[in-house]
């Protein structure tokens, strides 16, 4: 092939049939001996970041790309032979059908390489593929030649020839639209009739007797099993279309031996599957449309609520077509569905019932979503949050991000340039005014109004509004734990004692976990212009969080209370991701978060969804880094 041919100025190769684990680095190692490479890209799913099984390799010189195509096609990478062809960026060239031929009735042993070797004698091949499924070859394939003349030579010489003792059909490639048009035309002039549901006592002679009155038949066959017993269906092939049509019109739906038989046009398996698929998709779409905006998802149900009670609670808002509490082993799973007759009734029910306490629990009520919609919504939410975090130029503390390795999480407060980059939460509360409180009112302490919390006895340290000499105040954490600490209440410390307890050198904070609650004690080494010290706060323990306790707390404290209880549970499942997952879950409605605290299964389900989103994002970043490290240039 001429390397300077105008067909391939980009020197770009398509590499298909890749193993799912093949990466850009592996392809670079494989193809770099052929010549300098500009870039490599393995195409991946946008959500899961899994490989789609093909990649593009861009060489600097067309001659190098041609060398790779000639010498490496069908080479094995991770146990799978790869299929290489020129990259056709113009889809019209691929879809026009010029130079493309179709081969069927192939032996199972013929693979891509054998097909390529067989047809390469007729001209340059752009692509060659045997169609396969999980069981191997499906018995047909395609060969795309560079010119139409080569394709016509292959059809002329190979059609009807034997390949591995099987007579193959070789013909011009036809698009699906062309095939469907031909099939539709043939369907109107059918002569083959399919009959079913006539029982086991039917044979060929009797079937011929039944249908012979409509016209001469070329063949009659009742399908039987290994023992010769009828399978209950058969075929009659007439000479003329008019006779076949008359048989269908008169015999379809008639009773035979007490059974209603079906008589219709015989269809190929692919045609029948296509029609059934179309009907199924239509039914699915109709069902989605019918329940759009009227089906409600109800969560956090009391164990004593059954279908009748659920219907009774929602019946004041309109006509209910169905109400179902999901059960497992005879016990309620804590959620169910209520379907109304109109979207207006469903909207009213959501407005009135969401958050209402029924029996002993507050309900979570929302429009029901399919699993795909929920996952897409969660992924979209996460991507938006990540984009907003990247858009902030200054250091940002992630929502409830643990300060490694202590596990203490901090509120998300963006820093300004005139302030130290990292502060403990209580000092941020002092320094940063919040629009949710008036200038005269002080912002509550993070642990204020929490059961079992003891407020610091020492007064708040003064601070300076002057810009510090350094743009950052370093944050020093430690994994040490305070040993042999009893559950005693801290009282005021004299100034002298406080001075004596603070050494001149930098100190390391120590932590104690009491009854599932973090007890941070931090010392901040500030610059000379900022003099601050975080008093120790000792939390004796936490009472179980109830709906009434949550409702009585100020709105700004509710997420804090929920986060304090969610974080240890999530940390037990995923220690390294606990901070990020907690921040993601805190965007959910409070009543649903309360249900998660009471239901480990519900919490684990939501945590698993969040982990899937995080892993997808991390895989995307890892793939990007792998490309940059392998090629040293940006991906195309």
Curated annotation (Swiss-Prot):
Post-translational modification summary for this protein: Phosphorylated by MAPKAPK2.
MF-aspect GO terms: mRNA 3'-UTR binding; mRNA binding; poly(A) binding; poly(U) RNA binding; RNA binding
Keyword Transport assigned: no
SMART domains: PolyA, RRM, RRM_1
Keyword Transport: no
N6-methyllysine PTM sites in chain numbering: 299
Modified residues annotated as N6-acetyllysine in this record: 512
Region (UNR-binding): 166-289
Pfam families documented for this protein: MLLE, RRM_1
SUPFAM superfamilies according to UniProt: PABC (PABP) domain (SSF63570), RNA-binding domain, RBD (SSF54928)
Residue numbers of Asymmetric dimethylarginine PTMs: 493
Modified residues (Phosphoserine): 315
Modified residues (Omega-N-methylated arginine): 455, 460
Homology family: Belongs to the polyadenylate-binding protein type-1 family.
Functional description taken from the UniProt entry: Binds the poly(A) tail of mRNA, including that of its own transcript, and regulates processes of mRNA metabolism such as pre-mRNA splicing and mRNA stability. Its function in translational initiation regulation can either be enhanced by PAIP1 or repressed by PAIP2. Can probably bind to cytoplasmic RNA sequences other than poly(A) in vivo. Binds to N6-methyladenosine (m6A)-containing mRNAs and contributes to MYC stability by binding to m6A-containing MYC mRNAs. Involved in translationally coupled mRNA turnover.
Listed name of the protein: Polyadenylate-binding protein 1
Origin species: Rattus norvegicus
Gene responsible for this protein: Pabpc1
């Amino acid at each position: 092939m001429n390397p300077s041919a105008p067909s391939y100025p980009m020197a770009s190769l398509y590499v298909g049939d890749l193993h799912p684990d093949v990466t850009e680095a592996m392809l670079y190692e494989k193809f770099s001996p052929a010549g300098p490479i500009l870039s490599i890209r393995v195409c991946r799913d946008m959500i899961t970041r899994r490989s789609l099984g093909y990649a593009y390799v861009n060489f600097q010189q067309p001659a190098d790309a041609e060398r790779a195509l000639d010498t490496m096609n069908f080479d094995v990478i991770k146990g799978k032979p790869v299929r290489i062809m020129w990259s056709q960026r113009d889809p019209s060239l691929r879809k026009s059908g010029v130079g493309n031929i179709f081969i069927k009735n192939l032996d199972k042993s013929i693979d891509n390489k054998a097909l390529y070797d067989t047809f390469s004698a007729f001209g340059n091949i752009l692509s060659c593929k045997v169609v396969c499924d999980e069981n191997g070859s499906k018995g047909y394939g395609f060969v795309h030649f560079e010119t139409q003349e080569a394709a016509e030579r292959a059809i002329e010489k190979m059609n009807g020839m034997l390949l591995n003792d099987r007579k193959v059909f070789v013909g011009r490639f036809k698009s699906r639209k062309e095939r469907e048009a031909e099939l539709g035309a043939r369907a109107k002039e059918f002569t083959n009739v399919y009959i079913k549901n006539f029982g086991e006592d039917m044979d060929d002679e009797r079937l011929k007797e039944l249908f012979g009155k409509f016209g001469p038949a070329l063949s009659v066959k009742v399908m039987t099993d290994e023992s010769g017993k009828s399978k209950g269906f058969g075929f009659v092939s007439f000479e003329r279309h008019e006779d076949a049509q008359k048989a269908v019109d008169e015999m379809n739906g008639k009773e035979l031996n007490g059974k209603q038989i079906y008589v219709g046009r015989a269809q190929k398996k692919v045609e029948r599957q296509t029609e059934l698929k179309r009907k199924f998709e239509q039914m699915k779409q109709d069902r989605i449309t019918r329940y759009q905006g009227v089906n409600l998802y109800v969560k956090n149900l009391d164990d004593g609520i059954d279908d009748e009670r659920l219907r009774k609670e929602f019946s004041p808002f309109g006509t209910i077509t169905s109400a179902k509490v999901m059960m497992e082993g005879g016990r309620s799973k804590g959620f169910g569905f209520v379907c109304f007759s109109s979207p207006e009734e469903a909207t009213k029910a959501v407005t009135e019932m969401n958050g209402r306490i029924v029996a002993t629990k507050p309900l979570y009520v929302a429009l029901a979503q399919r699993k795909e919609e929920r996952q897409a919504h969660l992924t979209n939410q996460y991507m938006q949050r990540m984009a907003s975090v990247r858009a902030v130029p200054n250091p940002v503390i992630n929502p409830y991000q643990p300060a490694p390795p202590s596990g203490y999480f901090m509120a998300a407060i963006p820093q300004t340039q005139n302030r130290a980059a990292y502060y403990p939460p209580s000092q941020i509360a002092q320094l940063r005014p919040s629009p949710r409180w008036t200038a005269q009112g002080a912002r509550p302490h993070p642990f204020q109004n929490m059961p079992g919390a003891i407020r610091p006895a020492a007064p708040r340290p003064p601070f300076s509004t002057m810009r510090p000499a350094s743009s950052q105040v370093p944050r020093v954490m430690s994994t040490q734990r305070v040993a042999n600490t009893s559950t005693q209440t801290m009282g005021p410390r004299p100034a002298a004692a406080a001075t004596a307890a603070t050494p001149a050198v930098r100190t390391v904070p120590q932590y104690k976990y009491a009854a599932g609650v973090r007890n941070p004690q931090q010392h901040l080494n500030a610059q000379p212009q900022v003099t601050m010290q975080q008093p120790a706060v000792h939390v004796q323990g936490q009472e179980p969080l109830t709906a009434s306790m949550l409702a009585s707390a100020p709105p700004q404290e509710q997420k804090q209370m929920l986060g304090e209880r969610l974080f240890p549970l999530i940390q037990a499942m995923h220690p390294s991701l606990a901070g990020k997952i907690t921040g993601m879950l805190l965007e959910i409605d409070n009543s649903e978060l309360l249900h998660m605290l009471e239901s480990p299964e519900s919490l684990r389900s939501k945590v698993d969804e969040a982990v899937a989103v995080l892993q997808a994002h991390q895989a995307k970043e890892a793939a990007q880094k792998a490309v940059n490290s392998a090629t040293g240039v940006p991906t195309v």
